[in-house]
Amino acid sequence: MKKVLTLSMLALCVSHGAAAAQYALDNDSIALSFDDASSTVVVKDTTANHPLTPQELFFLTLPDETKIHTADFTIKHVEKQDNAIVIDFTRPDFNVTVKLNLVKGKYASIDYTIAAVGQPREVAKITFFPTKKQSQAPYVDGAINSSPIIADSFFILPDKPIVNTYAYEATTNLNVELKTPVQPDAPVSFTTYFGTFPETSQLRRSVNQFIDAVRPRAYKPYLHYNSWMDIGFFNPYTEQDVLGRMDEWNKEFITGRGVALDAFLLDDGWDDRTGRWLFGPAFSHGFGKVREKADSLHSSVGLWLSPWGGYNKPRDIRVSHAKEYGFETVDGKLALSGPRYFKNFNEQIIKLIKNEHITSFKLDGMGNANSHITGSQFASDFDASIALLHNMRSANPNLFINLTTGTDASPSWLFYADSIWRQGDDINLYGPGTPVQQWMTYRDAETYRSIVRKGPLFPLNSLMYHGIVSAENAYYGLEKVQTDSDFADQVWSYFATGTQLQELYITPSMLNKVKWDTLAQAAKWARNNASVLVDTHWIGGDPTALEVYGWASWSKDKAILGLRNPSDKPQTYYLDLAKDFEIPTGGMAQFSLNAVYGSNTSVPGEYQKAVVITLQPLETLVYEAIPAK
């Protein structure tokens, strides 16, 4: 990996009388430079020879719409620190530190830290890295707030999903609106990331690889049992209920079929429902016995908590205690950004990490994105959740954190969490076929509507799809025993999505030997093929229109293809693997296709060129593709 830092002193005189200097850094893909005479920064794609020079590094907009520009600050100090250039800007009312960083050998970032001087000061908005006519036709790729900016060969995205991204008529910027004063002793900080892509067909893959490189926990399957719709469904459950399920999973799955189960996640039903997130009567001594058994099975314990208090009657009970404990609420739900509620929630979850050794969290209900609670240090519940997630990672960097309702398809969530919700209902039905087939179509239609179309650069490998469902307290027919073929379709289509959050909402007694075998085989296959499935992306059409759709993932040595026909009629699909696998220019586009699940005579065993295939009604297929020698 190339790391170069140069410092050339320029014999120039600037207003403060010091000699000006130019600083430069580069890695394998990006060069950074800063000229302190003009406060000019250049971020350059060295492969495409394309520079981005902002009009200025930043500017502040005050409540009266007065703007404080970078040029209104004095440069107090500049220095290099390893792979970074640190610039301190000062003026009587604000100090701003800007840090230009090389990241992971091929990316770059700019950190901004803003502090008030002397007293708290109101700032309406901070704008970062505004550019004009630095790229031909920049755009924001996605309808979701903070979706990446694409500027020629660059992608640019914020580290926080509360930051807006903007591109219009060759101008771009990132900006954030502040609802609380900037403090002298508690600066606000934001980061802007820069990456490059070699050609248009590689944009999604390049963003995906960048996210996996910088996220706190790299992609890795997290297979686990979830108690929801099994032993718990808006009802408390007992320690013995949990221990009993663990024995069943061990017998049939862990010891029985040699499948590693990463965790047993206890969903709603464990707490005392006071909103304080304390143990309920059934777990008055904590999770000690559950954890001991999990340890003996080489597994761990995961836990559900809901920042806004949960759902239905349990939520109402928790919220009813809010006044008693001084907890803040918004729209009839507990408010994470409330000072007292945040303090309690944060303290309890850190205790669960440190004292109970909880290894994963399902945080269900992130709250409001826009409402500010008077007296809160946070602009919104979203803002509070970012602080919470940071604190959780500090307590244990290896946590798996799943954020459910309240999030959206901004890739920036993945700088804090491991997965987010696909949107929509937990389970529902759509289209023809049995309830299982209708559930699969609904699951994937919602994913297409809310993620693929609105956030096309969000990695499908980091979605919560609501798992594999075959549980006695499920509904819409999923509480009934499924046919072996329906269950297999559900299982294989689920693992073909490439998601690392692998949830099993399953009542063990509802599975026979064939189903256990199917589940074990598919789970092992997904773990063994994680290095390929990390690239999973959407192919085909819209499940809502009952069009053939699926998932594809590619690496140089192997690729994976999953296809499904959601219609009750046969349908054709134009199989163009160069397009479906998003193969880079010059890459091998001929493959040996091996069926992993299902069989279809219209799919060629030796793929040479694009071909029309026919999928039977409600057919699910999964293939491995090995490049031709």
Tell me what each language-model feature is.
Residues V4-C13:
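Sec-dependent N-terminal signal peptides
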Residues Q22-V86:
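Acidic-aromatic substrate-binding/catalytic surfaces of carbohydrate-active enzymes
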Residues A84, T90-D93, K104-S109, I114-D316, ...:
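Conserved structural scaffold segments of CAZyme catalytic domains across common CAZy folds
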Residues D185-A186, S385-N600, V612-A625:
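Active-site-proximal substrate-binding groove within the catalytic cores of carbohydrate-active enzymes
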Residues H224-L243, W270-H285, F327-N344, G367-F382, ...:
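The substrate-binding groove and active-site-proximal loops of carbohydrate-active enzymes
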Residues I231-P236, S300-E356, G367:
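Active-site-adjacent "subsite" loops/lids of carbohydrate-active enzymes
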Residues G258-W270, F345-G375:
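Active-site groove signature of glycoside hydrolases
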Residues G275-H285, G309-V330, L414-D426:
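Aromatic- and acidic-residue-enriched segments that line the glycan-binding/catalytic groove
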